[in-house]
């Protein structure tokens, strides 16, 4: 099943411009050591300036031994909050809260507004919330690459749901990433998503109320800039994806559309009876896969059933 790409004519130029604008912003990285630190792991609250000079934060956990370390950028689900990941004792982790998420609401606070409506302006896609969120992820890679205790040649990215889509976008837009693990991903094949999922039919009227002159074609054209299916062929690192065939939040067809557009080393794990969730068994499988890509025997993760 191959889904036709929906790239606008200026798609590549659009993203090159966003990256250039990000590069012009001084990141002003700041780190504050947290009392969550242990003998094995240092935990830091990190802060940085991103696209549009928006302040974002995350939690950086790094082993206290055997530097330099490989690193994993962990990305959040839709409007969720990321917290420190202290169990991976053989790799550093940056759990990022992009703009509008968790502790990154100084400059972008959705409050009662639907997050994905922020900056929805058909004439100015560069102002859309996901233009900034995608760049926030690249800024996080900048942070990891800047750290002397990190081996910048061993940085991977992971996430689930929205985080899975963000992981794919990060791998597409930043060649420093050496693997991408995307579970039950969102943000791909927007047309398929809006046709198959209740969100579209519930929210199209709200978009038309905000933009009375908008058309279905206009919505699809706008969202095509932020479609990971259209970015997939830019990914050069290995990709692990998973999907649950009973998922009624991120329709499986959209994940297949992205996967089939990939032109790199790729693996897809399909769970026939699961929905919009990631099983503990898959988490363990993914951690083993990521450890291998990072060149370590194990990430050191201890699962609840093993405590």
Segments and roles (model prediction):
Residues 1-42, 299-307:
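N-terminal targeting or regulatory segments adjacent to alpha/beta-hydrolase or S9 domains
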Residues 168-214, 270, 278:
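Hydrolase active-site cap/lid region
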Residues 234-235, 241-243, 247:
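Short beta-strand/loop motif that positions the catalytic acidic residue
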Residues 256-307:
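C-terminal catalytic histidine-bearing segment of alpha/beta-hydrolase fold enzymes
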